[in-house]
From Swiss-Prot:
Keyword Phosphoprotein carried by entry: no
Protein name as annotated: Manganese peroxidase
Polar residues bias locations: 18-35
Coiled coil residues, start to end: none
Chain intervals with Basic and acidic residues compositional bias: 1-11
Keyword Heme on entry: yes
EC supergroup of this enzyme: oxidoreductase
GO BP term, pick one: hydrogen peroxide catabolic process
Cofactor remark from the record: Binds 1 heme b (iron(II)-protoporphyrin IX) group per subunit.
A molecular-function term among this protein's GO annotations: manganese peroxidase activity
Keyword annotations from UniProtKB, A to Z: Heme, Hydrogen peroxide, Iron, Manganese, Metal-binding, Oxidoreductase, Peroxidase
Catalytic activity: 2 Mn(2+) + H2O2 + 2 H(+) = 2 Mn(3+) + 2 H2O
Superkingdom of the source species: Eukaryota
């Protein structure tokens, strides 16, 4: 994502929403893994 540097100047909200979605996806992946 090349828009990281630009979003930092404008507003970090869009990036935060993306990271939140990534965190959700990671948690789902971890839960789906067999223990």
């Amino acid at each position: 994502l090349s828009l990281l540097g630009h979003d930092e100047r404008v507003t970090p909200e869009p990036f935060d929403s993306v990271t939140a979605q990534n965190a959700r996806g990671n948690q789902a992946d971890v839960q789906s893994l067999p223990r």
